[in-house]
Amino acid sequence: MKDNCILTAESVTEGHPDKLCDTIADAVVDACLTQDAAARVACEVMATAGKIIAAGEITAAKIPDIPAIICRTVREAGYGGSDYEVEVITHEQSPDIAEAVCGGTETGAGDQGILYGFACDETKELLPLPVVLAHRLTRLLTDARRQGIIPGLRPDGKAQVSVEYRSGVPYRVAAVVVSCQHEEELPLPELRRDILCHVIRPAMQELPLDEHTEVLVNPSGRFVQGGFEADTGLTGRKLMVDTYGGLVPHGGGALSGKDGTKVDRSGAYMARYIAKNIVAAGLAKRCTISFAYAIGKAQPVAVTVDTEHTGIYSDDVLEQAVRTVFNLTPDGMIGTLGLDQPMFQKFCNYGHFTHADAPWERTDMTEVLECACRAKDMGVSHR
């Protein structure tokens, strides 16, 4: 990261069409795991005006009522749940993949993949400030709609925050963009005033707006038609919203719609868990963890740690400690983080790494990591 720069992150509300598809897919995963903790799920959702399609591979003791799940989830997001034709196209996991994943003594990775996790000491969430602020904006936008604080708001919306850094530290908010769906009768000047008062200013606790901050509310003007009526939604299209706002590398795999044997999900969560514990322990100010997996193989083929020269130990020592302390197989990650339990819909919105009660957000391994680093460092020093 450059010492002097502007970094930007975005977030979307739970009524955004792509994010609602993610939420539906995770609701399906949760329903499968509720009935069968060993369920194998890879669910994709596409939705457009008047139609929602759920498709993928599901191997479970019992297939849940997916149309009912879809209608309920759409209603919970603030739309009419019975206004769509629903089509479900599923089949069981490929026997070749099933054998590769489950045929050995250990569960193998459900696919190849490159996963990244990140943490920094910039905020109490141990995330970059633009990411935290963007998600806070969309949470407050949804709260303002649900609680009637701003009458006339509708479910679809998004936000973007640009933060200016000086000497590597957040200095000021350079720009805020909020776009929110609204009822036709709501005057735009009134909407802009209310969003500034009830959403934007309360969200900017760490860095209040200054006289030079550019604030844009519905910069395109009218935003009456939203959701699936305005844009086709698809799972896996909000990867940066789900993770680190584009400020950290991403391997390209989506999180939602997948059970824990898919390392796109379990590996990304585990990488965040490890990076957060490293930073929480004071072992580094910034930390990126990366894993690479091969389909059918339990152990990662690569593990790397990059602290951007902010660590109190070398990255090599930290990598050895990570390999020693954590079980990085799919079984190990599922067991450590409880990923065979139905929980994913709860953490699907407003970033997967902003929820303090998510298992991968725990900082319960700091002391173990510190001890492992000391031991590894002594071993390296005495070679």
What residue ranges belong to the model's regions?
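N-terminal, positively charged regions that mediate nucleic acid binding
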Residues: M1-A42, V368, A372
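Glycine-rich, mobile lid/loop segments that gate access to catalytic sites or pores
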Residues: T8, A68, R75, G81-Q225, ...
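Internal helix-turn-beta structural module
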Residues: T48, R286, A292-R383
